[in-house]
Amino acid sequence: MPTPSSTKSYAAVLPPPGPSWAGSLMGISLLSSLLKIHGFPVVADFFFALAVVVAIVIIGGWLIYRSPSFKTEVMPAWAMLSMGLIALGTASPVVLGDDLWGFMFVCWSIGTAVGLVAYSLYITAILRSKAGTPTFAWGLPLVTPMVASTSAAQLHEHFELPAMLWVSFGLFLLTLASAPAVFTRVYFYYFGPKAQGIPLMATPTSWIPLGMVGQSTAAAQLIGASFGSKTAITMGIIYGIIMGIFTIPLGAIAHFVFYRAVFKGATYSPTWWASTFPVGTLSLGAHFLSQSTGVEWFNYFSLYLIALMLFHVIVSTIAGTIAVMRRIVGKLKSQLA
């Protein structure tokens, strides 16, 4: 674990409870869904309960501290809150049963509304070159519609609402039209011929593009199955296989830069949670691809990714707890001095 050089350094990377911490809600909520899907109900219940607590702390924390404000430059944080609410809502009927489909719809509605606002404001800032230095966090507002698309397809399956299927397809296209180009630009900025390399504090965000890869694979399988035609199903499978190919180099980059940064003592920040949700989306995509193709080893790969995600959740939780406790102790010492 990284050792902080001072309490002040931790204060700089530990914002108050609020949307900046919503990566934890995203990761824990999705983990609970995946554990239930793969037959670990007791552990799934534990993580779902934890996700509920995290959601309450994040929302309550924002109501108290109002940090961050709802401004364009901090839309990535609000995009995380959007995806966290959608992930929590999606997990509820999966983990606790069909009685909570209504709760899922409410979470999806709120999360999607916030996400579309974040998407609109941030894509405008990027196009106008007002989003600052390129970073993988640029992609957070752009991936939000894809997360909403997956849940919309599931809502369509349950409630049998044709309009929801077209909403799902539209949200899918919204991310596909923007995120790949933006991520390509960021990769070129960090790893191109004239690049300086990715800063230590930004290394956890290298997982974010994998979130689009995994989430779009899952969405493509659900949308293809919902349309029902052989062509739609085949297109979804082909899309998933192509995304699977992209997973190899992008995953290798994320593993290398993130683990190297941790071993070099990168200071903890909420960005470490970026190593959780994207891995979970890959697991979800592999699981649905297994269902679409009947290829069982896709499901085994999904299980491996759950193990990796669980490892990242544990590391992020322990490192975060240590960081918060050191900050509290530091403040107490300064007050007693």
What do the predicted segments below correspond to?
Residues M1-S9, V52-P68, V114-S129, P162, ...:
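Hydrophobic, membrane-facing alpha-helical anchors
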Residues P4-L34, S67-A91, W108, L127-A153, ...:
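Juxtamembrane helix-loop boundaries in multi-pass membrane proteins
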Residues G27-S33, A55-L63, V186, M212-G228, ...:
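C-terminal transmembrane-bundle signature of multipass membrane proteins
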Residues S33-V43, S92-F103, A152-V167, Q221-M235, ...:
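Helix-coil boundary and interhelical linker segments in multi-pass alpha-helical membrane proteins
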Residues K36-G111, V315:
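Membrane helical hairpin/interfacial module
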Residues V42-I56, G102-L116, L165-A181, I237-T247, ...:
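Structural signature of hydrophobic alpha-helical transmembrane segments
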Residues M104, G111-F136, L155-M164, S168:
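Long amphipathic alpha-helical segments that form oligomerization/scaffold cores
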Residues I110, W138, T144-A254:
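Generic multipass alpha-helical transmembrane bundles of integral membrane proteins
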